[in-house]
Amino acid sequence: MSRSRVLVCVATMVLSTASLAMAENDVTFGVAADFFSKYVWRGQNVVDDWVMQPSASVGYKGFTGSIWANSDTTGEVVDDWEFNEVDYAIDYSSTIPGQETFGFSAGFIYYDFPNTAFDSTMEFYAGLSADLFLSPAVKWFYDFDEAEGSYIQFSIGHTMEKIASWGEEKSCDLVLGASVAYATDGYNDFYFGVDDGAFNDATISAGVPFTFGSLTIKPSIAYSMMIDDDVREATGKSDNFWGGVGLSYSF
């Protein structure tokens, strides 16, 4: 199937989800815009300056269709305010029947890189999570197009709810997270020219989302580092610290 047909199929699925959802009550819509001092993806410094990342999603009974983009605001890798990446995703998430403590997700992502020389690519993913102490989770991504390799992320997190509140629907939380990821030789060879599987990157993050009804404002900071020596040598900026603020609205 050609890339254009895949893109049309993904867009059709997202729109179909939205059309179906509008006729039902079990529906969620969301829009968001994040502003960060860098764009770091899986430990890779993609844009080393301020970016804006708008997104939109529609959900229906566990299914979610979403569109996410990255805008280079200062012309680091493309012209000012142009998009250098647009992602289209379909996700299904739920709990395991009879085991409400454990959840799972599965989906598809189409990565497009407008205004760049990079070819688009596609991934399937699947994940498991547990509603236990530190919320352990694992997520496997398989790039079956350009990289033909896997990226497996192990994560933990903790949320301190309502560290401050100003009424029933006005409060703020403290959200902490950490992850480490392993990538196979195919993935590392494509992205770094390293023909070995390795633990690639580790990330820690902290955020303080302020919730005002359906509106959330979330300042956050994060730090990531490349772990494997060969991968570190292949990346220009192996250690990254960044921060920013996200705005989201659900209805």
Predicted regions and their residues:
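Cleavable N-terminal export/targeting peptides
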Residues: 1-28
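Residues that define the transmembrane beta-barrel architecture of outer-membrane proteins
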Residues: 25-27, 48-52, 82-86, 102, ...
